[in-house]
Amino acid sequence: MRVRSKGQYRLFFNDGTGVYATFSGNKIAGYIRVDLGKVVYAVCSSEDSSGDEILFFGSDDGYVYQMDKGTSFDGSAVEAMLRFSYYHYDSPTRNKRFRKIQFEMSGDSTISLQFQPDYSFSDPDVPAGRTRNLNIEGSGGYWNIDNWDTFNWSGQIVSTAEENLDGVGTNMGMLILSEATYEQPHILQGVTVHYSPRRIRR
């Protein structure tokens, strides 16, 4: 299935899973695996009366579902997971004390996430990071530009939240989890990590 508005090509498999390939121009920007929880038998991409792209799929239960619409999977929570690759912050053999992390996100509603940092490629000799909960207020908007009731008054355009870290390692990766039924979609704009360099690992 081709999704013109997002520059995506979507492939679906007979177990309800799929792969979305996103393009930037003629180049692949990335892939993401999805699990719709329903077997996709037929797909349709069309336009509504406003000219906006709408997507549908038919499943083995006889129902037709609209994709990329609403906040749930037919009333069930949407689960999302993002794993960052390990990054050494430009010094792969130097230990670092990771002190704080700041998330930058945009979304129309409050965002509840869990995240777990992971140090030194999950080395069993390095203490594991603990799982933390994070609540981020929905983003603000611009008067006379954004749609009414889709932004928070007096809110930041990009919402931020920070949390202290207490890990030591040569690098850090991270797992971010989201599971919600009523949250609007959100976008992770950036992550800033504060750390102090330590000795070179020998």
Place the predicted regions along the sequence by residue.
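Beta-sheet repeat architectures centered on beta-propellers
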Residues: M1-R202
